[in-house]
Amino acid sequence: MELPKDPAMLLSLLNMKLRDAYPSLDALCDDMGLSKADIVSRMEDAGFEYDERANRFW
C-alpha cells in the first residue's frame, strides 16, 4: 500500500488504522510491510509524535 504524501492525510490514515484495526504501531507496520522508523520520521518531520499509551499520533 502506498501511503499518502500529504502529512494531514497520512495522520488521518494512520490514526484511523491504529484506532480500528491495530493494537500498536508495531503491529500496523508489521502487517502492512512498513518501516516503523520511516513512519515515525515522516510524522516527526510534520510535527507529530506517536503516543504509545493512546496508540495514536498527535
Residue ranges and their predicted role:
Residues 1-20, 24:
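N-terminal acidic leader/helix
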Residues 28-29:
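Short alpha-helical "recognition helix" segments of helix-turn-helix
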Residues 35-49:
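Short acidic, Pro/Gly- and aromatic-enriched capping/linker segments at domain boundaries
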Residues 52:
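Short, acidic, Ser/Thr-enriched surface-loop or helix-capping motifs
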